[in-house]
C-alpha cells in the first residue's frame, strides 16, 4: 500500500493506492480544507486514524449482548510521496501560502513509513502528467508534434502560480521543478504597465504569481475598479461575502458586467504571455500544459483566442510558437496521481 498527497494553500488531498506497475484508482481518498488545521501532521493523523463511530447503547430489555467492536489492524504503508505547494529542499518543504514546514524524514519516523518523499507540487503534477489519459486534457492549440521527444512545459495557476519543465533523458521524461512563478512580472501593453504600477504601490516585488492566481485575478479586478470606476454595486456586495476570484470568473464568463469581462481578458492575456515565455525558455516543442484549478474553470475564456494570441506574440518566433501543442489538464487530481506514481516506484 502506498500513500500519496497533494498539499495546497486551499485544499489538501490524501489517498491510499495499491499501485504496483500501472496507474490504478485510489482505494480511499479524502480532501481537507488546509486552513482548518494547524499542521499537515494533524491532517495526516486524522486520515490514517479517522474518528471511530460512537458505540451504540444497548436498548433496555434486550437480552442479546452486542458484539464488541474489533480494533482496526494497523495500516502498513510501504512508501509515501507528498506534493507540496512551495520549494522542497533536502526533503523539507515550506508551504508558500500556509505557515507549514513539512519534513519527509520526520514524517517517516512519526508515522512509521519506510520512505516519505516530498516534491514540489508542480513536480508532482509533472509526474502525473505522464500518467494522464488523452480525455483528461483539452486542446487549446493542436500544434505540430516534433519527430523526437523534446521538453514539455507545465504552468499552473491556482492559489499560487507553479511552473515546471519535463526533459527527455534518452530513456524517460524527468520533471524539473522551479519557482518561476515568483520571477518578475513583465507587462506587455500600456494597460499592463498601469497594472504593474498599481501593484507596486502594495508590493515591493511584483511577481507573476501576483497576477496569475486566484488572488491575482482579484488584484486585476481591483486595479480595473480603481482606475475605470465601473464596479456594479451588486458585484461589490457579492465579492465581500463570497470567494472574490470565483465571483469575478462567473460574472466575466456570463458577461454580466463589463469589469468582469475586462478582468478575464487581461488575466487570459497575461497567462498566455507567461506560458509562452516558459515555452521559449525551455524550448518545450513537445507541448505546454496548463494545470492548476483555474484553467479548467476558465476553459471557455482560454479557448476564445486571447490566450493563444498572447502565447504566440513573440515577434520573430511567432511561427515557432504557433507550432507548439498547448493543452489544459482537466483532471484536478493530476498532482495526487503523480505523487502516487513516485511512491509506487519508491515501494519497489
List each language-model region with its residue ranges.
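ATP-binding/phosphotransfer module of carbohydrate and carboxylate kinases, centering on a glycine-rich
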Residues: 1-54, 69-76, 194-348
Amino acid at each position: 500500500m502506498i500513500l500519496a498527497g497533494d498539499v495546497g494553500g486551499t485544499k489538501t488531498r490524501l489517498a491510499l493506492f495499491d499501485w504496483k506497475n500501472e496507474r490504478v484508482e485510489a482505494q480511499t481518498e479524502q480532501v481537507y480544507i488546509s486552513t482548518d488545521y494547524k499542521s499537515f501532521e494533524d491532517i495526516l493523523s486524522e486520515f490514517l486514524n479517522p474518528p471511530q463511530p460512537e458505540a451504540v447503547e444497548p436498548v433496555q430489555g434486550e437480552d442479546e449482548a452486542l458484539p464488541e467492536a474489533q480494533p482496526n489492524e494497523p495500516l502498513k504503508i510501504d512508501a509515501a510521496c507528498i506534493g507540496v505547494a512551495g520549494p522542497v529542499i533536502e526533503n523539507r518543504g515550506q508551504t508558500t501560502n500556509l505557515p507549514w514546514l513539512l519534513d519527509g524524514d520526520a514524517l517517516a519516523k512519526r508515522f512509521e513509513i519506510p520512505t516519505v518523499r516530498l516534491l514540489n507540487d508542480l513536480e508532482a503534477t509533472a509526474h502525473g502528467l505522464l500518467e494522464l489519459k488523452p480525455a483528461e486534457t483539452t486542446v487549446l492549440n493542436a500544434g505540430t508534434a516534433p519527430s523526437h521527444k523534446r521538453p514539455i512545459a507545465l504552468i499552473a495557476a491556482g492559489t499560487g502560480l507553479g511552473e515546471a519543465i519535463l526533459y527527455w533523458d534518452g530513456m524517460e521524461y524527468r520533471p524539473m521543478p522551479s519557482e518561476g512563478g515568483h520571477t518578475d512580472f513583465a507587462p506587455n501593453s500600456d494597460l499592463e504597465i498601469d497594472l504593474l504600477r498599481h501593484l507596486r504601490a502594495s508590493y515591493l516585488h511584483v511577481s507573476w504569481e501576483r497576477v496569475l492566481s486566484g488572488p491575482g485575478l482579484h488584484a486585476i479586478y481591483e486595479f480595473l475598479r480603481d482606475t475605470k470606476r465601473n464596479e456594479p454595486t451588486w458585484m461589490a456586495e457579492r465579492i465581500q461575502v463570497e470567494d472574490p476570484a470565483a465571483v469575478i470568473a462567473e460574472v466575466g464568463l456570463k458577461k454580466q458586467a463589463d469589469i468582469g469581462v475586462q478582468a478575464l481578458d487581461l488575466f487570459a492575456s497575461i497567462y498566455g504571455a507567461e506560458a509562452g515565455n516558459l515555452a521559449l525558455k525551455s524550448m518545450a516543442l513537445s507541448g505546454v500544459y496548463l494545470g492548476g484549478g483555474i484553467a479548467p474553470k476558465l476553459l471557455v475564456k482560454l479557448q476564445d483566442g486571447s490566450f493563444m494570441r498572447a502565447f504566440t506574440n513573440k515577434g520573430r518566433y511567432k511561427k515557432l510558437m504557433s507550432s507548439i501543442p498547448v493543452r489544459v489538464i482537466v483532471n484536478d487530481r493530476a498532482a495526487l496521481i503523480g505523487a502516487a506514481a513516485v511512491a509506487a516506484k519508491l515501494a519497489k
